[in-house]
Amino acid sequence: MTGPGAPRPYRRTAWGAAAAAVAAAIPCAFLLFGTGPSADWQDRTVTVPRGSRMPEVVSALHEGGVLRHPTVFRALVYLTITSRRLHYGEYTFSRPPSTFDVWKKVVHGDVVTYKVTVPPGANIYDVAALLREHSVAEPEAFLAAATSPSELERLEIPGNSAEGYLSPETYTLVKPVTPEEILEDMVRMFRKKFTPEMERKAKASGLSLHQVVTIASIIEKETGIDGEKPLVSAVIRRRLALGMPLQMDPTVIYGAKRFDGTVTRKDLRTPGPYNTYTNRGLPPGPIANPGMAALEAALTPADADYLYFVSRNDGSHTFSRTLEEHNRAVEAFRRAAREEEG
């Protein structure tokens, strides 16, 4: 038995263990939460490739100059059982990160995102340019995917390109992403929006999906006013029923790839599959990617017997039943244009 004044070894042992634990924790905490010098730090972007396993993730982060202690990172991943939660993508670091900061960002998938908005009426060339503008994909690669027979077959798209089936929408993209994946996202969105009810309407009208999308694309390029779209649809349907050429300028522009919107008399006389002045019926496929209003109008035209329309030069149009009415509307438009000029 020890007396009141005798030393207590177990207390010394406990204090020693605690001190050792603290001594060990300090460097561990530094390795986990410490950051590098920030004086000369510049924003750094690191890409973790798709399908990377933990060794590849660690390598990308370390070689990218944002992970100073790979061993500590690996230990943290193992201790937290998060090896299957490491996200691929592009990561930006605006200040020197700690090992914990890097782990948290990669586990949460805090990647750089790119928002690309495809407006109604954009064609595949416009979409390709948008992807380049946002540094997501090269135009040539996207256009190659959008016209690849194997891709079109895989996505069940009729025709010789994905034109018309790239749904106007704002897409949130994460790099690295392939043109084929972008294409699939846009086509999947189209399939989602084109409802079974719309499919039933098309069938009841005696139109294939491709014909509906083609008509809708012409409507989209002819007018930006939703209220006019059913009227343009009625003109198209009536001309088709009567065997008249559609005589729609946007189809000629698309065929000539003159996307500044101008069309010449020579263009109108030049034969080609998209020239609806020299050909009867619909062109071989869509000329743009139509929005929902144009698709609905293609399926449900207005109950009207118009055969003609002309621009008022303010975005709206005058619709006519006869050629005589149409010629008067054209003359009125030209007169107004002359007065405006001078």
Where are these regions (language model features)?
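N-terminal type II signal-anchor transmembrane helix
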Residues: G3-D43
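Short alpha-helical segments used as structural interaction elements across diverse proteins
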Residues: R8-P9, R50, T71, L323
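N-terminal start-of-chain detector that recognizes signal peptides
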Residues: G16-A21, G64-G65, Y88-E90, F142-A146, ...
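Signal peptide-directed extracytoplasmic domains
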Residues: F33-F194
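Bacterial extracytoplasmic/cell-wall-associated proteins, especially those involved in peptidoglycan
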Residues: R53, L130-E140, S148-G342
